[in-house]
Amino acid sequence: MSSFSVVIPCYHDEASLTTLLGQLRSLPGTSSQGVLGVQGILEIIVVDGADDQKCREVCGQYDARWVPCEPCRGQQLLAGTALARGEALWFLHADARLPPDPILAMERALEQNAVGGYFRFRFDAPRAWPALLLEPAIALRCRVGVPYGDQGLFMTRRAYMDAGGHSPWPLFEEVALVRGLRRLGRFVPLHEPLFIDPRRWHRDGWWRRTWVNRNLALAFARGAKPDRLADRYRSKTTI
């Protein structure tokens, strides 16, 4: 049984973070101090790219460690991982919403000799027809390509280190990591969903948001620099 360090990059998203931390602290067996002994959540590390006092206060309310950092998701994840003490690592975005018992699902995968895995992508919203089309398409993309960081990537600490860790980039920071993990062993999809906030799809439009995301992924695959892609992302979408 593993102890998990949860690492959460955040940037001006205190409302969503409050909900997520509340869910994490309400999981079966989780202590308010984050010390569980042989299994469960050992610690929660929030890496704040905005260096915001509000974020720090939210972390204090839920006994999460607050770490300021430059606003670059890859750098934030690296900073959080450098402080993590758990035998396993679980990376969550601040706007993620959890299934009932994610720790048990991850434990089962690791006990079956997986090096890590990811949760099924599902929008946290009433079932609109665009979501019903996009969710299976995303599942297929994950199997033939790379699951992204909003799907709750988890892995053993050793596998993370052996795979090379996150890239220090603002976008696509998990791509090399996931590919490295798959070379090491089984990186498995879980049946359990992680619920994704659809607010950005609502603001930008379902198909416009999807089109921009796919174009960025194609540009990255062709060798475009992540820093330049991040600038393009911010110019075309509502962050």
Protein language model features and the residues they cover:
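Conserved donor NDP-sugar-binding/catalytic core segment of glycosyltransferases
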Residues: 100-129
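Acidic donor-binding loop at a coil-to-helix junction in glycosyltransferase catalytic cores
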Residues: 171-177
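Cell-envelope/extracellular polymer assembly enzymes that use nucleotide-activated donors
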Residues: 2-5, 43, 176
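Short, well-formed alpha-helical segments that are part of the catalytic scaffolds
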Residues: 12-33
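Glycine-rich, basic loop-to-helix element that forms the pyrophosphate-binding segment
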Residues: 68-84
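Hydrophobic helical membrane-anchoring modules
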Residues: 1, 179-239
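A conserved acidic beta->alpha catalytic loop
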Residues: 48-56, 96-97
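Short aromatic/hydrophobic "clamp" motif used to bind/position activated sugar donors
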Residues: 89
